[in-house]
Amino acid sequence: AFYGVSLFEIINYIEHYGLLRQKDVNGKYERVLPEHSWNNNNIVTNLFLYQLQRHSDHHAFPTRPFQALRHFDEAPELPNGYASMLLPALIPAWWSKIMDQRVFDHYKGDLSKANIHPKKRKKIFEKFGLAFNRD
């Protein structure tokens, strides 16, 4: 059970790292869209994992059967499949080296839209040469 829960949580971390649904003027989160989770369109891996790496389609359309999950160009793309991302996800410096630039690129440099741990926010803004605002 420990192994299963741990694997589930690591994959969940990989699928959503740095991504954040924005709030509207009423404080409600925007509808879940394909750009709110990371995908990987590797055909072989998707066959073995029942299209799990087309995670964005699953979130945007939760009732769609796994066989029909689609690729979305607007969904952010992981550099490798889940199996290749497991070990880096457990080593923060390695993971940061792989993923932080991708989060930055996904939000077109506007890290105020990214999901960043409050204690690491200033460091990440400085890493990309951005002015840090505590607001």
Question: Which stretches of residues belong to each language-model region?
Answer:
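Cytosolic/stromal cytosol-facing helical appendages immediately following the last transmembrane segment
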Residues: Y3-D135
